[in-house]
A protein has these predicted regions:
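Oxyanion-binding "anion nests"
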Residues: 87-130
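C-terminal or internal capping secondary-structure element at the end of a domain, subdomain, or sheet
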Residues: 188-212
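Conserved small/polar residues in nucleotide/adenosyl-binding loops
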Residues: 214-221
Length: 221
């Protein structure tokens, strides 16, 4: 369900590229509905099911349309590098390479509590990026739609000194600054506080305010 809600993606591909339809149950009207791909209103890590529509819907089923002759998207730096270790590029070797990279960068949630990447990679105008490039020549980037530029949020956070640092029971993962980890007994408000301090620091330095993937909910007893 989360895949269809979030429009998950990595290395130049998103699940919206293969979703045919999504079935959802509305908890307010008690109705089931089948949404076409266009009904889902997919955008970058966004969909109809997020924001004001995220509460009523429970995703119960998705239908994917897969190609027998898929095209490969392997131009992202670390994926391209990892694939050089394989004799040929196939769907199987791409899968193995992606799994290897993710295991190196992301902690196991059964060992160290986390929700994966906490922040989205921001997409900014080319004009904004050129200004940043003059001030920070080493800033990495990837092309986005409509002539805009995607900047890795992990790099921005790392430049602000958060990577590998602990703030009480909340930590910024030492191998990937995008990931916030629960070091044992962190509460939601503590995680929110650390996330806000990261947002403020990045905005002050780069003029970019990172947006969270996650929805924090209050615990009710």
């Amino acid at each position: 369900g989360a895949a269809a809600i979030q429009n998950i993606g990595a290395y130049g591909m998103e699940i919206k590229d293969v979703i045919e339809s999504v079935e959802a149950y509305n908890q307010l009207t008690f109705e089931k509905r089948t949404f076409t791909n266009s009904d889902c209103e997919y955008g970058y890590r966004n969909s109809y099911f997020k924001n004001e529509h995220h509460d009523p819907h429970i995703i119960t089923y998705i239908t994917l349309r897969l190609s027998k002759n898929p095209g490969f998207s392997v131009n992202y730096g670390n994926l391209k590098e990892e694939l050089t270790k394989y004799p040929e590029v196939t769907l199987e070797t791409i899968r193995e390479a992606v799994i290897t990279i993710r295991r190196q960068k992301l902690p196991d949630p059964e060992v160290l509590g986390n929700a994966g990447s906490f922040f989205m990679n921001p997409i900014i105008t080319a004009e904004h990026f050129e200004k940043l490039k003059k001030q920070f020549p080493e800033i990495p980037s990837y092309p986005a739609s409509e002539g805009k530029i995607k900047v890795p949020a992990g790099w921005l956070i790392e430049q602000c000194g958060f990577k590998g640092k602990n703030h009480g029971s909340v930590g910024v993962y030492e191998k990937q600054a995008l990931v916030l980890v629960n070091l044992g007994d962190a509460r939601g408000d503590e995680i929110a506080l650390v996330a806000e301090s990261i947002r403020t620091a990045v905005k002050d330095r780069f003029g970019i305010e990172p947006v969270s993937y996650t929805h924090l909910r209050a615990h009710e007893t």
